[in-house]
């Protein structure tokens, strides 16, 4: 084995070097230079300083503006809640540990950080699935006329949390475990070891199939059908400027949704899968650290894609920020009316 396994950790360096120490007790500067840990801390500070205001502002604006309390917007707010969880319980901890060069909070802190980060990421992922299914049902009409109501929205939100807990909770109860990963400053599920006491292999397979491959397949299918439906509608109404505009907006939103998710999470999932299927292979700490920390950026641009590109949310945000005045000069009332019409037709909401 080209790594060192200890109690509640796996360091991707052989102990034959004589350098390996517990990531809960000693700085891991033999894995990366101290300045690289400081760069990591700076990156996380950037995500915190941007992600918390954007996600927090989404929640504040929704609370202030009754017109935003539409069923579909509840799912968008759920995304902001997920992002806030990742920032408050994941990024802050990792920022602190990166400054120190090791996971100073111990195994219990590692389990809590890994759980909260996984929970936030999974809530966001399954929120996207609910959005995809809602758009598919409303636009493609496989069930005929369908109105997305508040009860549907709350059921969808409950579904996202149930699925997220089904993924994040098992390592807390003995099915796999959370251990430091990459540069040993953040924690995630144990892809690395074959410890029979934790049944890591069955958990990782379950997680990949049920909490990555399945939701990605649903997103691709539903948005693929959505684009085809919008294109067909545009072809039948070529003189309709509103339909053509709707096609462009939906296509742009679909591209941003799909690529935003894939860009954030596919590198991490790919590297984790490679490590899982090549246990004992030689790899550096940065090989896992880079995609792991890059995936955290989703907490920043998720609200940009799913909220700031929504005219209704954007105008209300600007009104809140500028104390009741919208510097863009958009008519908020007409925007709300347009937004409501688009939600029930072919817009990306």
UniProtKB/Swiss-Prot annotation:
Residues carrying sugar: 2, 15
Principal location: membrane
N6-(retinylidene)lysine found at: 296
Cytoplasmic side of membrane: 62-73, 134-152, 231-252, 310-349
Post-translational modification note: Phosphorylated on some or all of the serine and threonine residues present in the C-terminal region.
Tissue expression remark: The color pigments are found in the cone photoreceptor cells.
Cellular compartment(s): Membrane
Topology of this chain in the membrane: Multi-pass membrane protein
Side Extracellular, residues: 1-36, 100-113, 177-202, 277-284
GO function terms (MF aspect): G protein-coupled receptor activity; photoreceptor activity
Low complexity biased stretches: 334-349
UniProt keyword Hydrolase present: no
GO biological process, one term: phototransduction
GO cellular component: membrane
InterPro entries with a match to the protein in the record: GPCR_opsins (IPR050125), GPCR_Rhodpsn (IPR000276), GPCR_Rhodpsn_7TM (IPR017452), Opsin (IPR001760), Retinal_BS (IPR027430), Rhodopsin (IPR000732), Rhodopsin_N (IPR019477)
Transmembrane segments: 37-61, 74-99, 114-133, 153-176, 203-230, 253-276, 285-309
Record keywords, A-Z: Chromophore, Disulfide bond, G-protein coupled receptor, Glycoprotein, Membrane, Phosphoprotein, Photoreceptor protein, Receptor, Retinal protein, Sensory transduction, Transducer, Transmembrane, Transmembrane helix, Vision
PANTHER family: OPSIN (PTHR24240)
Function noted in UniProt: Visual pigments are the light-absorbing molecules that mediate vision. They consist of an apoprotein, opsin, covalently linked to cis-retinal.
Family of the protein in this entry: Belongs to the G-protein coupled receptor 1 family. Opsin subfamily.
Protein name: Green-sensitive opsin-1
Source organism per UniProt: Carassius auratus (Goldfish)
């Amino acid at each position: 084995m080209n790594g060192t396994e200890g109690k509640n950790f796996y360091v991707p360096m052989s102990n034959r070097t004589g350098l390996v120490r517990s990531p809960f007790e000693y700085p891991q500067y033999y894995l990366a230079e101290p300045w690289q840990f400081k760069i990591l801390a700076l990156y996380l500070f950037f995500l915190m300083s941007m992600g918390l205001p954007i996600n927090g502002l989404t929640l504040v604006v929704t609370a202030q503006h009754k017109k935003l309390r539409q069923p579909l917007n509840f799912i968008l707010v759920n995304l902001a809640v997920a992002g806030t969880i990742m920032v408050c319980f994941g990024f802050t901890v990792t920022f602190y540990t990166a400054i120190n060069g090791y996971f100073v909070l111990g195994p219990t802190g590692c389990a809590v950080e890994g759980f909260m980060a996984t929970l936030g990421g999974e809530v966001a992922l399954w929120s996207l699935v609910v959005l995809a299914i809602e758009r598919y049902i409303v636009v493609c009409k496989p069930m005929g006329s369908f109105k997305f109501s508040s009860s549907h929205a709350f059921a969808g939100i409950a579904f996202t949390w149930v699925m997220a807990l089904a993924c994040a909770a098992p390592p807390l109860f003995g099915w796999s475990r959370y251990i430091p990963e990459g540069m040993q400053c953040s924690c995630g599920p144990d892809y690395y070891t074959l410890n029979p006491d934790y049944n890591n292999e069955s958990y990782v397979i379950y997680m990949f199939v049920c909490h990555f491959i399945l939701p990605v397949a649903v997103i691709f299918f539903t948005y693929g059908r959505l684009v085809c439906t919008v294109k067909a509608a545009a072809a039948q109404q070529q003189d309709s400027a509103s339909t053509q505009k709707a096609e462009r907006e939906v296509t742009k939103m679909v591209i941003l949704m799909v690529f935003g998710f894939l860009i954030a999470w596919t590198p991490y999932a790919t590297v984790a899968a490679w490590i899982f299927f090549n246990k004992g292979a030689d790899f550096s700490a940065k090989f896992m650290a880079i995609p792991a920390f890059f995936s955290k950026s989703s907490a920043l641009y998720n609200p940009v894609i799913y909220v700031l590109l929504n005219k209704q949310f954007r105008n209300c945000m600007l009104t809140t920020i500028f104390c009741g005045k919208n510097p863009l000069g958009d008519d908020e009332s007409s925007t709300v009316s347009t937004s409501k019409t688009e939600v029930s037709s072919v817009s990306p909401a």
